[in-house]
Amino acid sequence: MRLARKIVRQLRRGARHEVQSYYRRQPVLSNVVFYESFAGNGVLCNPEAIFRALLADPEFAHLSHVWALRSKHENRNVVREFAHDRRVRFVRTGSVGYFRALARSGWLVNNATFPTEFSKRPGQTYLNTWHGTPLKKMGYDINDPASRVANVVRNFLQADYLVAANPFMIEQMYERAHRLDNIFGGKIIDEGYPRIDLQFIDDAEREAGRARVADTLGIELGERKIILYAPTWKGTNFNRPEDDIDELLDRVTELRRGIDESRYVVVLKSHQVVHRFAAGRPGLKGVLFPNELPTNALLAVTDILVTDYSSIFFDFLATGRPIAFLTPDIDDYAGYRGLYFEPDEWPGPVARSVPQLVETLRDIDENGVSEAVRARHLSMRERFASREDGGATSRIVDIVFRGKTEGYRVVDTARDGKKSLLIYTGGMRPNGITSSMINLLNAVDYGRFDVTVVFPNSYRPVVVAKQGELNPQARQLARVGGMNGSKVTHLRRRLSWFTHNLVSHRTSAAQRKLWDEEWRRCFGGARFDEVIDFSGYGPFFSTLLLHAPDAERSIWLHNDMVSDAHRVTRGRRRHLRDLLGVFSLYRDFDHLVSVSASLNEINRAKLARWANPARFRFARNLANVETVLDNAAVPVRTAVIDPDTGETPPWASRLVRGSARKTFVTAGRLSEEKNHARLLDAFANVHRMHPDTQLVIVGSGPLLDALEHRAHVLGVSDAVIFTGHQSNPHAIMAASDCFVLSSNYEGQPMVLLEALMVGLPIVTVAFGAVADAVPEGSALIVSQDVEGLVEGMNAFLDGHVAAVPFDAEAYNREAISEFYQAIGATAGGESA
């Protein structure tokens, strides 16, 4: 049964994919406007204001209007309103009709985000209005993984126009919180918020509005004033909004008991997330304002607004009426989410409990607000609502639909003239490439370069943790969603991978279109001066980066790539197919960058059939000096505590640098190319002659069981420590006496530089790129066999291999200069 359900889901997904692909091949309809608000929750917010303005304007009578609704039943009043208007129709979010409208409409209007499948087509104009000036921190200003903001940023980058209610939205929300400065290719409209136009009404309209509120709630309003309670959503689980509803109900009940209901009526406007759950609570009958009606129409007749962290108060500023805040959880909430303004800056008194709020409201009724509050209110109104005059909608229609910009505030995002880099990091798993990426981003001159990194979306804790180590000055983009295109097109793409010949991405018109569309889906209108595949192991991102418009293209070669392609792990050449595909793309890259000069020559020779020899360059990886030294200073017994049990493994007590028992250490993935088997064979020989020795192998990998068995067969199990993966290998290295490397091949093993930084003598086999792996004279290089390793370890025990001083800062200065030269970012770009 489970398999059957899985097959059905896959068939449905495949069918939907084909439908989307079909409609994306059809012409764009310039006379159709497609609207979505709050993911289909209603005909609401800024999109509604624009929709009604276009519908009422005879100049736009030729336009058809399509609204996305999650439920027609929950929006039955508005559906009924337009039931006989042939220009208006409704589609269910996620339906065939939805994706048809999304693919074919010439105009797209949203106040949040379209789904990850969305990619704006040529001929479409996308207006994203967003849904409020934020008090709560947004985007990258919250210390959440990039995946949480990925689709928002992706939508913004697709947009032709973004709407800002005020300059703060431009500078703080768009440019900083969502990092659009330097890369956004569209325009930002700074002409006020369309939805706020509803608040500018005359006395007759106000009376009519009050009557509509009374009729909607089924209450007698009379002369009573309206207190609107409009809290934000503060839950952490969108699947359990009832947790928030219970709290809402209690507060509303307590508030109603505390006020004089002969003079006031309390109206609740719940957040979009919880409304349909709140609507079923009997205790909120006659209080809860319907979700399908415009909030700003309610604000127009509200006498006092009570909120917490909702952006609604920025809208209400335009009325000049009192605002009060109820924030019993402010200490926890401000610490968890973060706020752009402290409570003492808010335009109203702040209550920490409902009884305190009741007293505040009574004071406002009897005495008005204090002079200090009035001053804050006026200041914030000038800062955040100065554009609001009831005409924002008409101005935005002028700009977007008539193409008139003269006399309007239509601006670009900030540009500082820096060279822009887009770097694919790889999968961000804990490995040498990820460490090198982190080190590089810590060394880049952000005064000269605007840096964006992109990586596959992942929720794995170990990957998210590594993403968190990236320098925060680099903009992070997580690739979410999948490619568009028909199944036939994707079949041809996959067949090209099986034949190890990916050149069809540029030689086939259909494949070129597929990849160009994927670039636009991921990056919208963003433009980069340089794109860099820092991983160099995955054909997908290698191909994708080649479709960056007008960019220099570089790809990193972290190893002897031909040898790595033929590396056998558990009887299989796991990298062969992918790397042969990547090799076929080398001719399309401007720079092929190895991580050392000698490795550059190896790759230049071995890859001659795939790439122009003149395009090979080198740039050594950087060392993370501060982290290594800080880690090394941690006592080993502290560094290796098991986070699950809180216990220190018994072997930690055996690691004492300089003791009579000499400790050899190595660190790296337990895989074929590291050849730990050869190291074990050599150590067994040394240990027989010097029983007071031990070997520590730091790392994990597929060969762990085989290596443990080999140590047992060799009779050295008691003298060999397998630590498994360690978050701080440097503390273990610092507690050892000599570092040993036994690899078949390496690119530039950073572990050797780290060994130098912690002051270890080094014995290493003569792998192909060893000449550039460490500074000359800083390691004993031995033959790449058991005998060579035995000779090297014995030489250390005899006092002939010593630690050598290493100037890591000088090394890093040279390495970052090589990076700039390798990507052509400085004069004399050819470095080898």
Predicted regions and their residues:
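Short hydrophobic beta-strand element within catalytic cores of glycosyltransferases
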Residues: 305-306, 322-333, 761-764
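Aromatic "clamp/platform" in nucleotide-sugar-dependent glycosyltransferases that forms part
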Residues: 725, 744
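Conserved acidic donor-binding segment of nucleotide-sugar-dependent glycosyltransferases
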Residues: 349-354, 776-787, 794-800
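A charged, aromatic-enriched C-terminal amphipathic alpha-helix characteristic of glycosyltransferases
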Residues: 372-396, 801-830
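A short, active-site helix/loop in glycosyltransferases that binds the activated sugar's phosphate group
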Residues: 161-185, 564, 587-618, 623-638
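Nucleotide-activated donor-binding/catalytic signature segment of Leloir-type glycosyltransferases, i.e.
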Residues: 83-85, 274-291, 473-481, 708-724
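Conserved catalytic-core segment of nucleotide-activated headgroup transferases in glycan assembly
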Residues: 45-51, 194-278, 629-660, 671-699
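Membrane-proximal helix-turn-helix segments that form the acceptor-binding/catalytic region
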Residues: 99, 147-162, 518-525, 561, ...
